[in-house]
């Protein structure tokens, strides 16, 4: 595992070094005021960010002077390989003013860096431009919905995304792309998630130094796996802290699978998008790693939600719905009212309009929860609340048997070497189940766990009906890039 982690960490470091040493290229400066009378040959001035982007090609820089910019910005494949950098994280602001649209979208453009700026208040609509299509503040879009990888190389640092309304979709978002990193980022107030990585079976990605708060989900990652590292970050005051998940159809192809060496699937068949992984032992190489994070007080039922996040079980630090081969290690997981880690099998979609036709039954297999510190989780009380809840056996439910639910492969999940201060399910989980059991516990023949999860959904709905979600507060200033001229060719801003 150390070698795997080293590879992923080194990849993230490479991205930072490359960004810091951009070398030559044209410098396109965005200034709302008048340009100086004399400028170097390699420098051009523009009044809008979009105009500066349009004039850029691979190796060029877009430097943005402080100001509030009321525009949507789109980067296309013609601008692959450019840098977009604000000169002050807190004073360079792309402002959506609560209108429907996307803030900064990088569409099928590879190797694009975005750094040191703020994007805020872009919304999704009730009709027309819906969630996922709009309401995304910073979006590396490799071809959303295509089920294919459409771009490579997405890099962001010193970024702030926030929404003070109730219809912001995603803060910092990538799908259908591989090979990227985010460092020193912040997101709050989003009805889906603060950060999202999706639709990459082999993501080759790293997130570090993130602060995610006041979102429906701090992190969400549908069908994202392989080499994927979430580390050294804070997830607090969300409805749910971290939720990697399998999903169908969604950001396909499914499932979410953290086992090393999982290929990106091209042209999956409609009836079997990606075969269910068969996990034969607890001793498998895991490359999707959630480590060294603080995951605390994810109990915020005033945060905005959408149709998907509004039905998620609330109050957990980490949720693993239908996940395979993820490693949760060396985190502090504290003060989450339902469960520190909540892991369960996941039929999805759960209640389609045409019965269960088209449903995929995602198992829970090969995951490991080790060396974490759990403190004061489960304050809601009741069965299944506490530090860790591990539930399988849904195939034993009579309804699912009648509908052809497959034999359970929810095996070889492992819980070891954690510090617990609360209850676990099963009780004393490391002694009774731990890493020595091939199967996953099935409380009450599976029905009891389903009742618990559905009960949390109903509970959240009831609370929201009495006290509807509200816009979350704007954040305080965040740390700006120490030297925004680092690596930039000489120009009037960087002499």
Name the predicted role of every residue range.
Residues 353, 362, 377-495:
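Acidic, glycine- and Ser/Thr-rich low-complexity intrinsically disordered tracts
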Residues 85-91, 110-121, 149-165, 170, ...:
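Right-handed parallel beta-helix
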């Amino acid at each position: 595992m150390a070698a795997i982690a080293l590879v992923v960490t080194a990849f993230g470091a490479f991205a930072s070094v490359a960004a810091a040493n951009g070398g030559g290229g044209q410098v396109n400066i965005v200034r709302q005021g008048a340009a100086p009378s004399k400028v170097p040959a390699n420098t051009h001035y523009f009044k809008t960010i979009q105009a500066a982007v349009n004039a850029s090609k691979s190796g060029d820089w877009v430097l943005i002077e402080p100001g509030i910019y009321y525009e949507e910005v789109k980067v296309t494949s013609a601008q692959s390989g450019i840098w977009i950098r604000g000169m002050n994280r807190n004073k360079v602001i792309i402002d959506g003013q609560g209108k429907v649209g996307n803030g900064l979208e990088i569409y099928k453009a590879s190797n694009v860096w975005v750094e040191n700026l703020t994007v805020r208040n872009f919304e999704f609509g009730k009709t027309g431009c819906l969630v996922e299509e709009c309401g995304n503040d910073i979006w590396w879009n490799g071809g959303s919905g295509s089920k294919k990888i459409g771009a490579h190389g997405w890099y962001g640092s010193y970024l702030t995304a926030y929404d003070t309304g109730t219809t912001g979709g995603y803060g910092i978002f990538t799908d259908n792309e591989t090979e990227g990193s985010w460092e020193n980022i912040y997101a709050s107030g989003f009805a889906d998630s603060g950060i999202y990585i999706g639709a990459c079976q082999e993501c080759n990605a790293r997130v570090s130094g993130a602060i995610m708060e006041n979102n429906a989900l701090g992190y969400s990652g549908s069908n994202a796996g392989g080499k994927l590292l979430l580390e050294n970050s804070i997830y607090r005051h969300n409805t749910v802290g971290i939720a990697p998940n399998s999903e169908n159809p969604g950001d396909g192809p499914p499932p979410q699978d953290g086992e090393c060496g999982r290929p990106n699937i091209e042209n999956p068949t409609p009836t079997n998008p990606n075969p269910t992984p068969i996990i034969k032992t607890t001793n498998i190489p895991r490359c999707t790693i959630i480590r060294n994070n603080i995951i605390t007080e994810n109990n915020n039922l005033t945060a905005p939600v959408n149709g998907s996040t509004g039905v998620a079980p609330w109050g957990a630090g980490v949720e693993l719905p239908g996940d395979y081969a993820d490693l949760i290690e060396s985190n502090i997981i504290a003060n989450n009212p339902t469960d520190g880690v909540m892991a369960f099998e996941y039929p999805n979609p759960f209640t389609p309009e045409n019965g269960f036709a088209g449903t995929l039954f995602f198992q829970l297999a090969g995951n490991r929860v080790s060396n974490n510190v759990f403190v004061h989780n489960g304050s809601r009380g009741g069965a299944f609340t506490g530090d860790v809840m591990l539930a399988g056996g849904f195939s034993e439910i009579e309804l699912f048997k009648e509908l052809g639910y497959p034999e359970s492969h929810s095996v070889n999940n492992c819980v070891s070497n954690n510090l617990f201060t609360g209850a676990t399910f099963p009780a004393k989980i490391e002694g009774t189940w731990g890493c020595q059991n091939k199967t996953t516990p099935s409380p009450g023949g599976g029905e009891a766990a389903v009742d618990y999860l559905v009960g949390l959904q109903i509970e959240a709905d009831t609370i929201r009906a009495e006290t509807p979600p509200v816009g979350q507060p704007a954040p305080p200033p965040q740390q700006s890039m120490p030297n925004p001229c680092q690596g930039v060719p000489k120009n009037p801003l960087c002499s």
